């Protein structure tokens, strides 16, 4: 037998030993210490307690009276919580939920059970949301939990406009309030929001907080306030407070000219699962700012995740769900010519994008695995609808709903029909799901589906967008009746893209003006609402040609599409045809700007003096 074989660890023996200790505990065999909490006795083994708890290790090894006692009374400890920790000590299983985790953390902190503390920290960080972030910030500060504190603070900054009215915000300590109000990362579009939050906190308990008037108001960047707000605010103050306020505002002057992070937000087109410009990877995630005409790199979804569903909520939170990941231990080549060499596994992953950190944060997974599910946000909940899956037709009908406050998924009424592909939008708190020439409407309050008017054309893989009380169904592949043959949308030569409009008030479809496109192009149309206008992002060239992208804008009154913007090929490379496209507000300073690229062809490839560059004809200068 080799030396390596002799040193192998028998994990089965370790598990068996733990199981035997558990049986000794349950049968009260060989116990040598009794913990007493609130009149409840817990016979235990000193060795087990000392192994998991620094508190008990110090107690039993100190040589003091407690080390010789057979009964120890514990103060300020809950009996039910102690039972959870003891069970963990003997089994490694930790039972916790939203109602017990904070008490469990407090007890584990007192008993110095580091493993339990770490598990509780991870649980709480995962559960942070707009409803509890302020309270968890105070909780983390109380127990000096820096990791939890920073995560909670980032959520407070991100959701500031939603949380500063909460009672938990009114009860923040002075130091925590200053830490928040002084932050450059507050997601506010106006400094008036910060001023209002500061005044609400001060007025919550005027008598005890008047001493903090100057220090609190010094965090307000007065130069960012409108002149009307400055004048009205100062004139409305009591005479005794005016000098204090003036001193406080004077202290804030060095920060006058630095905007909050939320003031730098730009509305961007977000491309998930676009073809990568890096030949060593298949996909990339980028965003394009139409105002700045710049492309920024987003953190790609974890574990090479692709074929996901995407959604941006009204609160500007970005989520992705479902998709596929490469199987582990398979020969994987990430080059673009080796897609078929990799085996994939369908997953139920669900991620939230932390825009400050430019990273994807895992949330509770969906109940079903899904490929390219339709994701929408309706009445504060996120719905995952259909999608392709390994469960066949039955699974394609399933619909589940995510509660952002509870971080949990529940099933709702299934789709009336099963489809491999569908598009979904939300209008007037109702969800409209479309495929081929069919459309169904889901009413969340009654949890029911109703079939709506059929479209005039049968198309799949189209792009849909809601604009006001209208739904636009754009592009896609025509399905020939009874044949299943798919033809490009629009005219025979592909020189336009078909558009249909649905009026939710009249329950009727009508044809709209087609979108112009170059002959034989491959549009890859994506409908979006940007700058309060309905637009389409599309490719003007065939996939075999150099990629050239444009955006068109629709005029509802004139029923006309007009060119909004040409996008330089030096800015945006070939995105492929399977990318997801949505619109959200992001912070340029938190993103990595994509480097400038020279034109694909610096000179004409055929030697002529005139050639096309970025959509324009360019002539070589005379020699």
Swiss-Prot record:
Keywords: Kelch repeat, Phosphoprotein, Repeat, Ubl conjugation pathway. Pathway: Protein modification; protein ubiquitination. InterPro entries: BACK (IPR011705), BTB-kelch_protein (IPR017096), BTB/POZ_dom (IPR000210), BTB_POZ_KBTBD2 (IPR030586), KBTBD2_BACK (IPR047074), Kelch-typ_b-propeller (IPR015915), Kelch_1 (IPR006652), SKP1/BTB/POZ_sf (IPR011333). Residues 31-98 form the BTB domain. Substrate-specific adapter of a BCR (BTB-CUL3-RBX1) E3 ubiquitin ligase complex that acts as a regulator of the insulin signaling pathway, modulating insulin sensitivity by limiting PIK3R1/p85alpha abundance in adipocytes. Targets PIK3R1, the regulatory subunit of phosphatidylinositol 3-kinase (PI3K), for 'Lys-48'-linked polyubiquitination and proteasome-mediated degradation. Recognizes the BCR (BTB-CUL3-RBX1) E3 ubiquitin ligase complex substrate, PIK3R1, through the 4 tandem C-terminal Kelch domains. This is Kelch repeat and BTB domain-containing protein 2.
